[in-house]
């Protein structure tokens, strides 16, 4: 294999000169020396003439100097795939970082850059994925084999929601789950790992009994690692789909950091930025990854992606580019979070392609449509209420406002993963309970119950119990 020498280092971007044969684009180069006790991997990104290639480093370039030698491996970054990866934590280049010893059993190595499945291989599923979260199951249901996006600004609950989805779906799910931590907090990665051990999704004593693989490239990593770690995780998920014929759950937190890392690299590579300083290849980079997340005749990949929205602006190029790839969008709103309603999902902004009578059934569709109509009417009446007060509304509008406020409160729900913060036990609500509960509210069956009874409960039976305890407290007070 040919050897190149470092001629220039610019943070995460390194130029190397090869005298005997240039490595191909996307090839991995390995260092002859060790930096901080381990080999450094570079990925070839550009050929810039005079036998010089420009590469992206997958780890810190601290300690590197001009003249250091790197060897062309002759292939892209290749990572372990297969059942022996279950229960383990990997980094971007497929090295184990959980300190639980080497991989046991057989495994293959697969390159992280691949083509998406062809048209003839792809398959559409029309089966709803029940999450146990009322607002999602009722108003923006997820499809098995679909792509789901959780949009939200800083601190509105994206990671808590994705962890609850992992808790609710991965536990009940018989297949495998792959989690990609892309440029997020290391503490959250550690919390998730411990949560998975507690809930038996990962068995640290017998890894082969685990149901999940974790791949981390966190905030402290250089942009090369953050830009490629989602592809590493996706390669592992694709193997389970194609070779094990599994229905795989693929979680990404956070897809915005993938774009952000691409933007950092793009600037270091000397490309002219496009709108809002993003890389000119934003749509291409996103498309190349998203098209690989597909369901085929062999198996399916259902992906749930958290998407940070800079400055709460959904028209920012990064979230806007991601929107076009998704089947369902769950939008988290700061206004709803400020009202103390968690999960802070905006019921009117969130969308789903599966919200049609053919897929979810006539009753579910009618209840969801009526709930949205009531909430929309309440939203349009809020200006009148703010200026003139409730007394100026017609009797019909007063009933709508009353029901809308109950619906709003009832869309809140205590989460299993947030029990330590809320002090309330988490609730998983079945789809039939969700539909019948909301049907009762819109038909006026629960108009006599106080608004507070609907807040932070699971099914309607809990709201009725809460109403009785409120009544008893008020009675005792008198």
UniProtKB/Swiss-Prot annotation:
- Assembly and binders: F-type ATPases have 2 components, CF(1) - the catalytic core - and CF(0) - the membrane proton channel. CF(1) has five subunits: alpha(3), beta(3), gamma(1), delta(1), epsilon(1). CF(0) has three main subunits: a(1), b(2) and c(9-12). The alpha and beta chains form an alternating ring which encloses part of the gamma chain. CF(1) is attached to CF(0) by a central stalk formed by the gamma and epsilon chains, while a peripheral stalk is formed by the delta and b chains.
Q: Which GO terms describe its cellular component?
A: plasma membrane; proton-transporting ATP synthase complex
Which SMART domains did the record assign?
AAA
Which InterPro entries has this protein been placed in? AAA+_ATPase, ATP-synt_VA_C, ATP_synth_F1_bsu, ATPase_a/bsu_AS, ATPase_alpha/beta_chains, ATPase_F1/V1/A1_a/bsu_N, ATPase_F1/V1/A1_a/bsu_N_sf, ATPase_F1/V1/A1_a/bsu_nucl-bd
Give the lineage.
Bacteria, Pseudomonadati, Pseudomonadota, Alphaproteobacteria, Rickettsiales
Could you tell me what this protein is called?
A: ATP synthase subunit beta
Which molecular function terms from Gene Ontology are attached? ATP binding; ATP hydrolysis activity; proton-transporting ATP synthase activity, rotational mechanism
Please tell me whether the keyword Disulfide bond is annotated for this protein. Answer: no
Q: Which residues bind ATP?
A: 152-159
């Amino acid at each position: 294999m040919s050897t190149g020498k470092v001629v220039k280092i610019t943070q995460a971007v390194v130029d190397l000169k090869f005298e005997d044969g240039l490595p191909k684009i996307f090839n991995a180069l390995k260092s002859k020396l060790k930096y901080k006790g381990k080999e450094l991997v570079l990925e070839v990104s550009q050929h810039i003439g005079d036998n010089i290639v420009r590469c992206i480093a997958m780890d810190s370039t601290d300690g590197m100097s001009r003249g250091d030698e790197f060897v062309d491996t002759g292939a892209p970054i290749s990572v372990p795939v297969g059942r022996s990866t279950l229960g383990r934590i990997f980094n971007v280049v497929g090295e184990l970082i959980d300190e639980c010893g080497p991989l046991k059993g057989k495994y293959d190595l697969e390159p992280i850059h691949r083509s998406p499945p062809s048209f003839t291989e792809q398959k559409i599923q029309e089966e709803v994925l029940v999450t146990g979260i009322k607002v999602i199951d009722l108003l923006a249901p997820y499809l098995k084999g679909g792509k789901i996006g959780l949009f939200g600004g800083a601190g509105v609950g994206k990671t808590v929601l994705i962890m609850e989805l992992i808790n609710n779906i991965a536990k009940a799910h018989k297949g495998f789950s792959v989690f990609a931590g892309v440029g997020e907090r290391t503490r959250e990665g550690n919390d998730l790992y411990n949560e998975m051990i507690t809930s038996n999704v990962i068995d640290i004593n017998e890894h082969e009994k685990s149901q999940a693989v974790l791949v981390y490239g966190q905030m402290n990593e250089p942009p090369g690692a953050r830009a490629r770690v989602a592809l590493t995780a996706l390669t592992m998920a694709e193997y389970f789909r194609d070779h094990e014929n599994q229905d795989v759950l693929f979680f990404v937190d956070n897809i915005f950091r993938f774009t952000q890392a691409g933007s950092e690299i793009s600037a270091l590579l000397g490309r002219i930025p496009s709108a809002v300083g993003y890389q000119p290849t934003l749509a291409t980079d996103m498309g190349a990854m998203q098209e690989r997340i597909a369901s085929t005749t062999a198996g399916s990949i259902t992906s749930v992606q958290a998407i940070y929205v800079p400055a709460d602006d959904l028209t920012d190029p990064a979230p806007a580019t991601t929107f076009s790839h998704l089947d369902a969008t769950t939008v988290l709103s700061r206004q709803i979070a400020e009202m103390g309603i968690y999960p802070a999902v905006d019921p009117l902004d969130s969308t789903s392609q599966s919200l049609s009578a053919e897929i979810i059934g006539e009753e579910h569709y009618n209840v969801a449509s009526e709930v949205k109509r009531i909430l929309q009417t309440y939203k349009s009446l809020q200006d009148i209420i703010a200026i003139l007060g409730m007394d100026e509304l017609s009797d019909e509008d007063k009933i709508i406002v009353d029901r809308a406020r109950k619906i709003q409160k009832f869309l809140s729900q205590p989460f299993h993963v947030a029990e330590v913060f809320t002090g309330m036990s988490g609730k998983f609500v079945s789809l039939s309970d969700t539909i019948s509960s909301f049907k009762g509210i819109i038909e006026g069956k629960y108009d006599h119950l106080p608004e507070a009874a609907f807040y932070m409960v699971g099914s309607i039976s809990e709201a009725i119990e809460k109403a009785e305890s409120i009544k008893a407290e008020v009675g005792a007070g008198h």
